[in-house]
């Protein structure tokens, strides 16, 4: 550890100066994961989720949710209805709010207009930067981020280039995320790794690091459009990267699993994982979100 830490601090310093050294990146973040160790940990988290299940924890889960609609038939009335629900998800308790409402860029202005007219507040998340494929020119990705922020998005969810990741071109992955981060201005950046398309856990770890080094405020598992979305396996790897970053720099990066999380028990498994790897200080909406469209329904059944 004594020899690794100064090297990585130097790498972090140089990366933020725009010098991404590939050899140093590979030396510092290239690692393999023990599948048996991960499987044992996941079994523990799933059991702990059952023990966590109570009304207080369910209320906390609701506050982690980025309440999402990302469909081709989304209309102004549909996203406004979603925003109303995100602001007051539990009718009997107006103090509870979802983490944000998440919509396509074209619908940001609809949510913003509703919030202004009703004098209500909510974080507005928008997917941008070539969502969900990432197969766009960088200029168009950056422009979409800029337009989304101008329309009122307070949080931007971009997606990395899986093509670059699978080609092990981590410098390009990093540089594209960095360009989008700069375009965000004061908006928070959540970077989606689309882990279901990265093939290996080592790639997930490297993608996590490339995204963190580029200044991501959160790293997120999935777009929700892949054939395999959030899993506890990739969450374990991503949170391991976040933990290592915090150990070395003292800086905290958030974590967002998304895609296919529909039940309270599933959500609480991620809560148990984050609690174990990152600690209680991560269990708040500033550092932990869950991207979901139907999870709220199951939460309300449990209250």
Curated annotation (Swiss-Prot):
Pfam families linked to this entry: DeoC
Source superkingdom: Eukaryota
Keywords, sorted A to Z: Lyase, Schiff base
Molecular function (Gene Ontology), one example: deoxyribose-phosphate aldolase activity
Biological pathway: Carbohydrate degradation; 2-deoxy-D-ribose 1-phosphate degradation; D-glyceraldehyde 3-phosphate and acetaldehyde from 2-deoxy-alpha-D-ribose 1-phosphate: step 2/2
Catalytic residue positions: 157 (proton donor/acceptor), 220 (schiff-base intermediate with acetaldehyde), 256 (proton donor/acceptor)
Keyword Aminoacyl-tRNA synthetase: no
A Gene Ontology biological process term: deoxyribose phosphate catabolic process
EC numbers: 4.1.2.4
Record PANTHER family: DEOXYRIBOSE-PHOSPHATE ALDOLASE
NCBIfam families membership: deoC (TIGR00126)
Similarity comment: family membership: Belongs to the DeoC/FbaB aldolase family. DeoC type 2 subfamily.
Protein name: Putative deoxyribose-phosphate aldolase
Organism: Caenorhabditis elegans
Top-level taxonomy: Eukaryota, Metazoa, Ecdysozoa, Nematoda, Chromadorea
